[in-house]
């Protein structure tokens, strides 16, 4: 039973940086930046919460272990409820999470966050932000600089192109996923 979610939330689409297991698979270890990363992220999320008078909800990465890493300063953390929170969100914040697709499909404002500690992750952030016509938000900027940023802008043309290029082949096809799978299987057999 999912609680009533209204657009009172700012949703952070978490990628479990710097603990994400994929880094270990490629021989990278970014745990040394954890304290600085989470300190800066919390300062920024508190800023954005105050600016818009909205609660920040962390939509945790499915493999996150925040029961081991108490890093979000008492912010609400939800697991496996990302779509529901994005659907009712005011804005979404991320680095380059694949769950950004939910925000695009649902036409939600997205801001792509960067800080110098995650230089190793700048390329994917740049790529997704650019494809959606968004500038990257450097959370190391001063409050006066951050105050100038429009966090609620949506570029409809870029969102539609992103959907066509990266999410679906045919936006006119209104069948659900399983109807498409069944039709493709029937063609083959």
PLM regions: where:
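A short acidic, often aromatic-flanked loop/helix-cap motif at beta-alpha or helix-coil junctions
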Residues: 1, 65, 82-87, 141-148
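Conserved catalytic-core segment of nucleotide-activated headgroup transferases in glycan assembly
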Residues: 1-67
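Donor nucleotide-activated moiety binding/catalytic core segment of transferases
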Residues: 54-106, 110, 116
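Alpha-helix boundary/N-cap detector
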Residues: 36-39, 154-157, 176
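Catalytic binding pocket for nucleotide-activated donors in carbohydrate/polymer assembly enzymes
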Residues: 69-74, 98-172
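Short, surface-exposed amphipathic charged segments that create phosphate/polyanion-binding patches used
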Residues: 2-8, 91-96, 148-155
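C-terminal alpha-helical cap of glycosyltransferases
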Residues: 167-189
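Hydrophobic, Leu/Ile/Phe/Ala-enriched alpha-helical segments that form helix-helix packing faces
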Residues: 40-52, 103, 132, 146-149, ...
């Amino acid at each position: 039973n999912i609680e009533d979610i209204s657009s009172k939330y700012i949703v952070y689409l978490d990628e479990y940086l710097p603990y994400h297991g994929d880094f270990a698979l490629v021989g990278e270890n970014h745990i040394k930046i954890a304290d600085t990363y989470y300190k800066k992220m919390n300062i920024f999320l508190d800023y954005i919460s105050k600016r818009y008078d909205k609660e920040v909800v962390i939509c945790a990465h499915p493999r996150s272990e925040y029961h081991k890493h108490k890093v979000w300063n008492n912010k609400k953390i939800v697991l496996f409820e990302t779509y529901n929170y994005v659907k009712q969100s005011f804005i979404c914040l991320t680095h380059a999470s694949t769950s950004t697709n939910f925000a695009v499909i649902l036409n939600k404002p997205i801001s792509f966050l960067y800080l110098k500690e995650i230089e190793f992750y700048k390329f994917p952030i740049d790529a997704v932000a650019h494809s959606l016509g968004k500038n990257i938000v450097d959370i190391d900027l001063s409050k006066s600089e951050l105050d100038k940023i429009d966090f609620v802008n949506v570029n409809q043309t870029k969102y539609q192109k992103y959907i066509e290029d990266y999410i679906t082949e045919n936006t006119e096809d209104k069948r659900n996923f399983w109807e498409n799978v069944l039709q493709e299987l029937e063609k083959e057999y």
